Each structure stands twice: as structure tokens, then as C-alpha cells.
Regions:
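Divalent metal-dependent hydrolysis catalytic cores, especially in the metallo-beta-lactamase
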Residues: 664-684, 702-708, 738-749, 759, ...
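Histidine-rich, glycine-flanked metal-binding segment
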Residues: 61-66, 606-646
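Short coil/turn segments that connect the beta-strands within blades of beta-propeller domains
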Residues: 45-47, 85-87, 129-131, 173-175, ...
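Active-site neighborhoods of metal-dependent hydrolases
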Residues: 732-750, 791, 796-921, 993
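Acidic, glycine-enriched loop/beta-strand segments at the rims
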Residues: 601-614, 627, 880, 906-909, ...
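A flexible loop/linker signature enriched in serine peptidases of the S9 family
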Residues: 50-58, 73-77, 90-102, 106, ...
Length: 993
């Protein structure tokens, strides 16, 4: 059996059957004539063009015409390269968890996988004799050029520089390989194959891509991207048009005097001497059938007591008798001797307490809280309830074995140690990218953390591995003292150990083991005294787990599952279930209230502004919207006769942070935001946020939430679930149902076929799925796409070019499918552009009083050194196409929902800025407001309750001074927000708690 056939069977088993049958019904057919970020390669005989479009390979006649597809969905194929005899194509594909090289015959037969394994192999190019492929790979810890001999599979490393070398191209005579390098003298180099001698072919301050040798081998063509401009270079001459959007892929030489390349969404031919380019037209048809399903209903104010799901960061006491955890904003304690214990509340206030950890004596708990305004570390005497502030700006912490010190991470992820008694704090390590909670070595001389270990600096993804860090300096031979160097420890090569956050590793008190969450399960492995792995891992939990913690004797571990708390005996493996009897009840309905609006926009499509109307609210819902009459008023009357009333705003992409404390909820309402959607979070933190707000323990918006994003074997952000091989899909979906997720988020390294399985499983449960992908996500039935650009495993965006332009494929697929898109223009340079034009928010009292001081400080720094002149014009040139895309999508019937990826830019402020971008892109203010009200409400299955101001809907609305239907910037002028019938004047929201 051929290797490709064996691979097909293996993939079908791991990822589910390919080509699953679709229900009867007419498919949607889309004919494309443009592609975004597509590559093209001309065959050696000059008769056929190979395109990579939508993650598949297509063949087009050299003079243009219909495209013939070579590959089905699921391979994510890119970078096609013809063999010298024109019989085969090499390409890179992401069929499983890593990029590998493949070849296929030009007739679509004999598909072969050439490389395999845990490393990424990209950008193939044939040797002139057709026996080898040059490619780039991260096998050495950075990207180098390698070759593979096709007959034997033998791999040879070509470049060895510690910088990243990539995008190789063999010279016509086979003596040299050209490549791009990011070494100190950045540029395109050539390396002599037989001697290893290297020379610089082209240096440039711009970012360079994909060399292609001239037919005579004297120089190379390449692409340069320089801010808002791209160049197609031959030697030192730019032959591209002045506004041309040249895609960063290898050009083909049609003759010694003409190149074929991709730009402006099409294939072009251009003479080496310059002049006008000639477009090669093509059409490519895709067809898909999206299966309807019923979204699971969300009850915002359920009747009666509800079980608390948001138990955060449980930790077992040293003697194993109790577990402390956070829920509903407070700390709680339960005994481990009862399967249904009654919790004891340890704190009871309006603030947010979280991240509890026991001192070794079992009498004290350290935790983080915003009880004095900013998030700080505190200690609590469990017996007396006395609390004591230890240090400011502390998040996750761990007690030293002697209990005298706390190792902790500050708000910038800098590792520090504080003496508990004296409260003296010192830095022990520079900033680490969002590591997990530290865990002390038993000798108290070091800590370990789960931290991201990227495979290279070219791309950001990697695995979570164990980072050992010394916390005290040691004497050196010269009599001074220095910190021992960091050490990486990889207990399970190429597999994440812990998911950062509070998921291990946790060093056992006896120093003999570490516990961590691996593949979603509680796992322990033996270690030497210095933490070096000393044996194979053992899985202890029968279910997905989080938050491991040891008893002092090292005999038991507590962990958290979707169904509650667990304690496992490390020796005999027995697991005891502990389900605390903790419930929450929806806040009672508020008294009746009437809002008298001078102007009202109800949020419905095509709806005109109504004048002088009353919105009558009883309990949580609107009972009447009618022309103003004093005799129909009920309860308190809110006089908005001089202002405008619009539906409460929905922020469709934000990441909530416990570091903002309880003020986070107030700041959202202060900007008119009554619902937020959090597309990636710790699952239990997301549930806690929802339950604390719905129960009335905290003021805040409604929370639409998911859990940790589902990803491939490599991850980037903490909490990312590495679905190695797809074996945990069913368990993760079951967990999502059990915890009441509102939707599922998949991330960029998840293979397409796994995404298909997740979409189908989530839809069976009534849960929508969103990701960064458009195709084949569209064909698989995905519900949404995040970011008009965003991170991509390909190293470039298939949704937007380097000049931030999107073409017909993006527009047509989004409009035809009805899939939502959350553009997040503000994080693609938009926020800086608008702030340069008008830094209105910098001194806004909402920012001054509700945000951490660093936010306002950053704003003042922007205002002090604003973008201006040519730099501002360059940024605006990159932002304007994104704005125009939004306008085109909405005019074409597409579904745009406003979101920002805050707090990259400030909460609330960023959403208002995002809507201003949409108006700049051609939307009316009314249509822009709908992207943050009615459209997302319908998309999330919440249209019955949210999104418009109509009788029967929940009373979520905003009163603003001015007229945002005439001037979208007036939406900044929030006077009060009504959320579920509760009136929140802005001045009251700004008052300290």
C-alpha cells in the first residue's frame, strides 16, 4: 500500500471520515475570479498555471480560463512549485498538526507526503535535476534551509546561521540556493551548494520575500513589503506599479523578459523592462451546503437556585482536610470529608477575590483582590478572617516551602519574590510571556513554571514546557553572586506540559514528582532533585482536569473537573468526588421605570429615528414603546428628552481580565456596553464572571462566553487546548456543554479536518463555532470568523494582503455564507490613527477613574508623540482598505459584528472607535450601530431578548447626549445605561465602591 493511501486511512481514523455526507439540498455555488494572498506558479512548458486558492491547488490555462481543482478540502495546500519536467507539483500542506511537503501529479493522481514529524517544513522548491526539494524547516530550533532527496527521504541541512533562513530557490544550474534571511544584515543570500560559501544578493530595509532566479542565473526577482507599499524587484529595479498590491510569493519567469506573479487579487504578467501588466483571468467555482441547526437557548434570569459552575482555582490544604476556591467574587472553603459539603464563605464584599493558595502551615491563604482599588496580593487568616495586604500588582502566587516568601507574577508577567513579614519585594526575572503560576522547588532555591517555548522566532507558536528559574543568586568563583541560568525541561517532547495559567507543573512537597495537566488530564511524572524528568508520565484523572494542588505528604492531589472538585490518591489512583452545595440566584427584578426619549433608534434594519417617545419598562423587560404621554409612565422617569436612546451595545470580541477587578463591569456600562462576548478565557473564570453579574454580586454587562480555545499541537496563548491528533474532541465538547458555554472558539493551528469535527459536534449541541478561518470553515458550517486580518498559521493572512486589502474571494464567501465577521480594525492600526486625529479618550473621566493608571499613561504618551505627517498617512493607507471592506460587506448583505480584541486597546473606548471606522468605510451611523446591537444579537441566537428596543425585549439601552445617528462620535457621550431595567447613571458608575 502506498504511503499516501496509508496516510489517508490514518487521518480518517484520527480526524473523522473525510467528505461526510451532506443532507439533501441545493448547495451554494460561488464563482471566484479574485483571490487574496494567493500564489501562482507557471509550468516549465509555459502552458499551465498552478494556483493556491482557498487552501487547495488549482490548474489554469496560461492564457486564462476556468480553474481545475486538484485537491479536496482539508489539506490547506500552499506554495506550489513545478518539477523541472512539469509532471508533478510540490507544495506545503497542513493535513495534520504540522506543515509538511507533498507532491502530486499534474493530473491529480499519486499524492505523496514527502516529510513528516513534529516540525514545520515549508516553501518547497525543486532542484534543476528533479531529485531533491529545498525547503525551510524549524528542525534546528530556528528556520534553516534543508534539502530532501526524493528517492530516499534523506534530509540535509544547508544553512546553519542562528537567524531564520527561509524561502529557498535553486539556481538554474543547481550550484546555488537563494534564500531570505533575517540575520543582522537582513536580505536575500545565495549559498554555494558544494562549498557552503554565502554571498548577499539583495539587501533592503523592507521585509523581503521569495527569491526567484532569472533564467540566466545572474540575479533574482523578489518581493519587498515596505509599510504601505509593495515592490516587485528584479535585481535592484522595482517593476511594480505605484499602487500595486504585490503578493509575497515567488514569481515565475515566463521568458527571460517576462514574469508571472500575483497582485491585486489576480494573476499578472509583466515585462522585466516595466510597463503595464497584463491580467490572466481565471474563474474557480466552490460549492458548499451549510446544514441548518438550532442554537441552544440562553436564559438570562433563570428561575430558582442555579448550581455554581464558576469555581475558580481550587487548592487543597496541606493536611488535605479542606479545599479553598473562589466563586461569585469571594473565597470559600469546603471540607474534603463529604461528597456534598456546605461551603463556608471566607470573604464577603463587592470586590473580586481569586487565585487562592495555602501557606505550608495550613492557617493562611494568600489571594489576589482589588479591595484597595488595584489588584494586589493579600493574606487571609482562615480562623479569624483577618486580611493583610502584602504587595501591590500581584496576580498568581505560591508560598515558599518555609512559608516566609511568596513568588508571584506582577501585571507585566515579571517574576518577583516578596517577604511576607516585611513586604519587601524584589524582581528575580525579566518579563516572561504570560507564564503559569510559579511552583517552588522543595529546597526553596528555585521555582518552575509552565512557559511558552517557541520552535523558532520566525513564528510565535510552540509548546508549553517547564521553565526552571533560580530565585536567589549563588556565589560565583570571583566572590560575587549571580543567578543560575534558566533551564528548560521537556518531560514529554513536542507536547505541552500544563497550559500555563493554573494548570501545572506543581512540584510535590517531597520533591519526587511534578503534576501538570497534559492532553487535558491530570498527569504526574517523577523528577530528580533538580526537577529533571526521571521517568515516564502517569495519567491520574479519568476526566478533563485543571488546577492541580498537592497535600503536604505528597500522597494526594486535588483537581477540578467540569462536574466539581476531585481528590485523587497518587498511590492507588482512587478518585473522590466533591460537589460543593453552592448555588446562585438571579438578581430580583428592579422596579418599573420609564425612559422619555427625545430621539430613539430602536436598532431594527431600516428603522427611522423616532422622536418624543416613551420606553416603559417593568421588571427586566420593555413593555411598551409609544409616543410620549405622561399618563403612561410607570415608576421612575428618566428624562432623556434632550438626548438620544439607542440599544445597549454589544462588544463581540473582548477578553475579560480579573486584573481590572470589579471596576471592569462598571467601565463597560459607563461606555454603554450591556453585553460582551469573550471568545477565549479560562472556562471557570468565564462562568464566574457571568454568575457574579447575573446574581447581582457585581455590576456589569451580560457575558456571552466560551472557554479555552481549541488548537493544534502547537499553541501560543495560555489556556490554549492542544488537540494532538484529535483524540479529545468529544471530551472537550462534552465539557463545553457541561459548563454551559455559549459558543466554541477554535484557533489557528487546528487542522481543517479537526475543525470540521468540532463544528459538527458543536452544532449537534446547539453551539456556534468561530475561528480565524474563512475557507474551508465556510464549507464546514462555521458560524463566524474573528479579525479581518488576525494571526494565521501560514505566516500571512488569507483574508487580507500585506497592504490590508481583501479581494473578491473574501467578500463573496462571507456574503454568500452568512458567516459573521468581527473585523477588529482597531488592532490593525486603526486605534492609533483615530487617536492621532482626536485623542478624546485620554482625559475622559471614565478612563481616569475606572481603568488602571497605566491605560491613561499610555494614552498620554500617544498624545504626546502622535502619528503625524507621512507616518500618519502611511498608517491611514493601511487602515482605509479595512474600512472599505466593512462597507462593501454590509452593502452586499454580509453580517459584520463589531468587536475589538480589547484590552489590546482600552475596553469600551475601542468599541466606539471601531464603529467610527465603519462609518469612515461608508456605513451610515445607524448601520454602524446595528453591528453592535441587532446584528450580533441575532447571530448569537439572542435576538429574542437583545439587540433592539422593542416590547418584550430585555431593557438594555443607552442614553447619550447629542445625536449619534447624525454624528457617530456622539456615541462617546454616554449619560446613563439601562441594563435589564436597572438604571446606571455614569456619574454613579464612576463613584468608588
Amino acid at each position: 500500500m502506498r504511503r499516501s493511501a496509508v496516510l489517508g486511512l490514518a487521518l480518517a481514523a484520527a480526524y473523522g471520515a473525510w467528505g461526510l455526507a451532506q443532507p439533501a439540498g441545493a448547495p451554494t455555488r460561488v464563482t471566484l475570479s479574485q483571490g487574496t494572498s494567493m500564489a501562482a506558479a507557471l509550468s516549465p512548458d509555459g502552458r499551465t498555471i498552478a494556483l493556491d486558492l482557498l487552501g487547495a491547488l488549482w490548474l489554469v490555462p496560461a492564457e486564462g480560463g476556468p480553474a481545475r481543482r486538484l485537491l479536496e478540502d482539508g489539506y490547506d495546500a500552499h506554495a506550489p512549485a513545478w518539477s523541472p519536467d512539469g509532471s508533478r507539483l510540490a507544495f506545503q500542506a497542513y493535513a495534520r498538526d504540522t506543515w509538511h511537503l507533498w507532491t502530486i501529479r499534474a493530473d491529480g493522481s499519486d499524492l505523496r507526503e514527502i516529510t513528516a514529524g513534529p516540525f514545520d517544513d515549508r516553501e518547497p522548491h525543486w532542484s534543476p535535476d528533479g531529485t531533491r526539494l529545498a525547503f525551510s524547516s524549524d528542525r534546528s530550533g530556528h528556520y534553516d534551509v534543508w534539502t530532501v532527496t526524493l528517492a530516499t527521504g534523506e534530509l540535509t541541512r544547508v544553512t546553519t546561521h542562528p537567524a531564520n533562513d527561509s524561502m529557498p530557490a535553486w539556481s538554474p544550474d543547481g550550484r546555488d540556493i537563494a534564500f531570505v534571511s533575517d540575520r543582522e544584515a537582513r536580505g536575500i543570500y545565495a549559498r554555494r551548494v558544494d562549498t557552503g560559501a554565502e554571498r548577499l544578493l539583495a539587501g533592503d530595509k523592507a521585509v523581503l520575500y521569495t527569491p526567484s532566479w532569472t533564467p540566466d542565473g545572474t540575479t533574482v526577482a523578489y518581493v519587498a513589503v515596505d509599510g504601505p507599499a509593495t515592490r516587485l524587484m528584479v535585481g535592484g529595479t522595482n517593476i511594480a506599479g505605484p499602487q500595486e498590491d504585490v503578493f509575497p510569493f515567488r514569481a515565475s519567469w515566463a521568458s527571460p523578459t517576462e514574469l508571472l506573479y500575483t497582485a491585486d487579487g489576480v494573476v499578472k504578467r509583466r515585462a522585466r523592462a516595466g510597463g503595464e501588466a497584463r491580467t490572466v483571468p481565471f474563474t474557480a467555482e466552490v460549492a458548499f451546503t451549510r446544514t441548518p441547526y438550532t442554537l441552544r437557548a440562553r436564559e438570562f434570569s433563570p428561575e430558582g437556585p442555579q448550581p455554581v459552575r464558576g469555581l475558580m482555582h481550587p487548592a487543597i490544604s496541606p493536611d488535605g482536610a479542606a479545599i479553598v476556591f473562589a466563586a461569585l467574587g469571594d473565597l470559600w472553603l469546603v471540607a474534603t470529608t463529604d461528597e456534598r459539603p456546605e461551603p463556608r464563605r471566607l470573604t464577603d464584599d463587592a470586590f473580586v477575590e481569586t487565585n487562592p493558595v495555602w501557606a505550608p502551615d495550613g492557617r493562611t491563604v494568600a489571594f489576589s483582590s482589588d479591595r484597595d482599588g488595584g489588584v494586589a496580593l493579600w493574606t487571609l487568616d482562615v480562623a479569624s478572617g483577618a486580611v493583610r495586604r502584602v504587595v501591590g500588582d500581584g496576580t498568581t502566587a505560591a508560598f515558599s516551602p518555609d512559608g516566609r516568601r511568596l513568588a508571584y507574577l506582577d501585571g507585566e508577567s515579571v517574576l518577583r519574590v516578596v517577604e511576607v513579614a516585611s513586604r519587601e519585594s524584589r524582581q528575580v526575572h525579566t518579563r516572561i510571556f504570560e507564564p503559569g503560576r510559579p511552583s517552588w522547588a522543595p529546597d526553596g532555591k528555585a521555582v518552575v513554571m509552565s512557559a511558552l517555548k517557541p520552535y523558532s522566532t520566525r513564528f510565535r507558536e510552540g509548546t508549553n514546557q517547564v521553565l526552571w528559574v533560580a530565585v536567589d543568586p549563588t556565589p560565583t568563583p570571583d566572590g560575587r553572586a549571580a543567578f543560575a541560568p534558566d533551564r528548560w525541561m521537556d518531560p514529554i517532547p513536542h507536547k505541552s506540559v500544563g497550559m500555563r495559567e493554573n494548570l501545572g507543573p506543581v512540584w510535590s512537597p517531597d520533591g519526587r514528582s511534578m503534576a501538570a495537566i497534559v492532553d487535558g488530564f491530570l498527569t504526574v511524572y517523577p523528577v530528580a532533585r533538580d526537577g529533571t524528568p526521571a521517568g515516564p508520565p502517569t495519567r491520574l484523572s479519568p476526566e478533563l482536569a485543571s488546577s492541580p494542588s498537592w497535600t503536604a505528604d505528597g500522597r494526594r492531589l486535588a483537581y477540578q473537573a467540569a462536574g466539581g472538585l476531585r481528590v485523587v490518591d497518587v498511590v492507588d489512583g482512587r478518585v473522590r468526588q466533591i460537589a460543593p452545595r453552592l448555588t446562585w440566584t438571579a438578581a430580583p427584578p428592579p422596579p418599573a421605570v420609564t425612559v422619555h426619549a427625545g430621539r430613539l433608534f430602536d436598532g431594527r434594519a431600516g428603522s427611522a429615528v423616532q422622536r418624543d417617545v416613551d420606553v416603559v419598562i417593568e421588571g427586566r423587560r420593555i413593555v411598551r414603546v409609544a409616543p410620549h404621554r405622561d399618563d403612561q409612565h410607570r415608576g421612575e422617569v428618566v428624562d432623556a428628552s434632550a438626548g438620544t436612546v439607542v440599544p445597549g451595545l454589544i462588544e463581540s470580541h473582548t477578553h475579560l481580565s480579573k486584573a481590572y477587578g470589579e471596576a471592569q463591569g462598571r467601565l463597560w456600562l459607563a461606555f454603554g456596553v450591556t453585553t460582551v462576548r469573550n471568545p477565549a478565557t479560562n472556562a471557570f473564570e468565564g462562568q464566574e464572571e457571568r454568575e457574579a453579574i447575573e446574581s447581582g454580586r457585581r455590576i456589569g454587562p451580560r457575558v456571552v462566553t466560551t472557554g479555552e480555545p481549541l488548537d493544534g499541537s502547537r499553541i501560543y496563548y495560555p489556556g490554549g487546548v492542544a488537540l494532538d491528533g484529535g483524540g479529545l474532541v468529544d471530551q472537550q465538547l462534552a465539557r463545553a456543554e457541561a459548563l454551559g458555554f455559549d459558543f466554541i472558539k477554535t484557533y489557528v493551528r487546528l487542522p481543517d479536518r479537526l475543525q470540521q469535527r468540532i463544528i459538527e459536534g458543536a452544532h449537534r449541541a446547539g453551539l456556534p463555532v468561530t475561528s480565524h478561518e474563512i475557507y474551508p470553515a465556510v464549507a464546514y458550517g462555521a458560524d463566524g470568523v474573528e479579525h479581518v486580518r488576525g494571526t494565521s498559521r501560514r505566516g500571512y493572512s488569507p483574508k487580507m494582503s500585506e497592504l490590508r486589502r481583501s479581494y473578491g474571494d473574501v467578500e463573496q464567501l462571507l456574503i454568500a455564507s452568512g458567516m459573521t465577521i468581527t473585523p477588529t480594525i482597531t488592532i490593525q492600526g486603526g486605534f492609533q490613527v483615530l487617536t492621532a486625529r482626536d485623542p478624546w479618550w485620554v482625559e475622559d473621566p471614565r478612563v481616569a477613574r475606572l481603568f488602571p493608571p497605566a491605560v491613561a499613561e499610555a494614552g498620554r504618551a500617544l498624545r504626546a508623540s502622535p502619528l503625524a505627517g507621512a507616518e500618519l498617512a502611511a498608517r491611514e493607507a493601511l487602515v482605509a482598505p479595512q474600512e472599505r471592506l466593512v462597507g462593501a460587506l454590509v452593502r452586499g448583505g454580509g453580517r459584520v459584528i463589531a468587536g475589538t480584541d480589547s484590552p489590546i486597546n482600552p475596553y469600551g473606548v475601542a468599541l466606539l472607535s471601531e464603529l467610527e471606522h465603519y462609518v469612515r468605510g461608508g456605513l451610515s451611523p445607524a448601520d454602524a450601530i446595528r453591528t453592535a446591537t441587532a446584528v450580533p444579537a441575532e447571530a448569537f441566537g439572542l435576538g429574542r431578548d437583545l439587540g433592539t428596543i422593542e416590547a418584550g425585549k430585555l431593557a438594555d439601552l443607552v442614553v447619550v447626549d447629542g445625536d449619534p445617528l447624525a454624528r457617530i462620535t456622539d456615541l462617546r457621550r454616554t449619560r446613563l445605561t439601562v441594563r435589564g431595567g436597572v438604571v446606571h447613571p455614569v456619574d454613579r458608575l464612576l463613584a468608588p465602591r
